[in-house]
Amino acid sequence: MNTSPGAPTGVRAFVDSQPIGRRQRIIVLMVFLIMVADGMDITLASHLFPPVIRDWGVPVSAVTLVVSLGVVAMAIGALVSGPVADRWGRKGVTVVGFVLFCLATAGLGLTGDIHSFAALRIISCFGLGAVMPVALTIVADWMPKARRAQMVSIAFAGVGVGSIIGAYLAAAVIPTLGWQVMVLIAGLAPLIILPFFVALVPEPAIISVRRGIPEARIRSALALVAPDRDIAGVDLTRAGLTLGAGEVRAKALFAEILCRPLLGVTLLIWGVFFVVQGSGLLVLQYMPMLLQAPAPGLSTVESGLIVAMYGWGALIGQLTIAFILKRFDRFIALAAFIFWSVVGLLIVAAFGTGFGFFGYFTLLFAIGLSLPATAAAMQSVTTLAYEEEFRATGMGSAGFAGRLGTLTYGALGGTLIGAGFGITTVSLVLAAPLAVSIGLVFSLRALSRRAGIAPEPHQITPGNEVDDAHVST
């Protein structure tokens, strides 16, 4: 690609033309570590509330309300953070959200009643909800289109690592030191990441151009990503942001993702996120209880080992799909992983009460390979659906839909178990909307192709990045 002053290149075309370098790998690593903190919170929260109920003598209904308010706060955080990040920058939103999450989580260990506990938990969840979509958007903004889906999925795999670490941390700390020490560790330890993130992760160049940041600072950021390339010919004026159909118009950012040709795409993304994240939450949150029910009647230790194996399956599946997305149609890969999840759940529904420990051990590992990986794939699908100018808004709105899914499925799981239904019925109820979501994925594929949105990563070659980005030079 010519980067001489006589042939100006748009920012996106310049990033797309670069192979992934050392600084981009560092960016992925930093966001991966932030996702680890997110995954730790998911697991630790499930271990946190039983001792809170025991120590303070609060009713289960009060804790249920705290959990529900926390999920709502996550959803609002995701929804609000996207437009703010699109207008004022990704990096600052990520840092503020992460600090809120860490400090509020650590503060839980200093509370003495359910009211102050609930207030801090809501703040913590708001920060956490804001961080995930914006941090993943930073990864997407700095990656070439051909590798964007893969790198976003690898960064998201940190959630799986965090869930495993959280489970072991809870098992080691709570029985000996108490839940207060556990939340102090979970809140303060991730802050170690922050100075490295601030120092090593530059603000995405395209957002800096939109904000009118001095060109010298933007060129410095581009030089970090592509130290061996001449960046003098990169167009850092607003004219260089014109990405064809993705050009931002003078209207609200939410209107951008809800107008044609993106309306149908956005609604389908919301639908799949709702089902996928809700299903994953229900399995993680209620599987120990279902396994310890009279049928199948497993012990606490056995159910714990099975859920841990589900976590390992999740990690392997998320890393696996990251490399699959580099080579194959992302929609086909996503549909295949959802289908595998449906098959596993239907096997449990059909023969669940007849399985012993090893049967569930194997099945839950298999479901872990597929179901959590669909969430990673959806993050990648979403980053490729939206241009940089409103990508964080699209990611945040998808995160909002996913959090609403976790809230709905959490209530559904509690209702089913409270009504006396066991693992076979719950698995069948889970399988049905997942099967429907396969149809949503293929509809999303058709709409995306019709609208000419984000060609498949494997279709992009080094000679056609500029054309794919629709950059005017």
From Swiss-Prot:
Gene Ontology CC: plasma membrane
Primary location class: membrane
Transmembrane stretches, start-end: 26-46, 60-80, 92-112, 122-142, 154-174, 181-201, 264-284, 305-325, 331-351, 355-375, 399-418, 422-444
Pfam families associated with the record: MFS_1
Database matches in InterPro entries: MFS, MFS_dom, MFS_trans_sf, Sugar_transporter_CS
PROSITE patterns to which the protein is assigned, alphabetical: MFS
Subcellular location: Cell membrane
Keywords associated with the record: Cell membrane, Membrane, Transmembrane, Transmembrane helix, Transport
Gene Ontology molecular functions: carboxylic acid transmembrane transporter activity
Side of membrane Extracellular, spans: 47-59, 113-121, 175-180, 285-304, 352-354, 419-421
Membrane topology: Multi-pass membrane protein
Residue intervals on the Cytoplasmic side: 1-25, 81-91, 143-153, 202-263, 326-330, 376-398, 445-473
Domain of life, source organism: Bacteria
UniProt similarity note: Belongs to the major facilitator superfamily. Aromatic acid:H(+) symporter (AAHS) (TC 2.A.1.15) family.
Protein purpose: Probably involved in the transport of 1-hydroxy-2-naphthoate.
Record-given protein name: Probable 1-hydroxy-2-naphthoate transporter
The species this protein was found in: Nocardioides sp. (strain KP7)
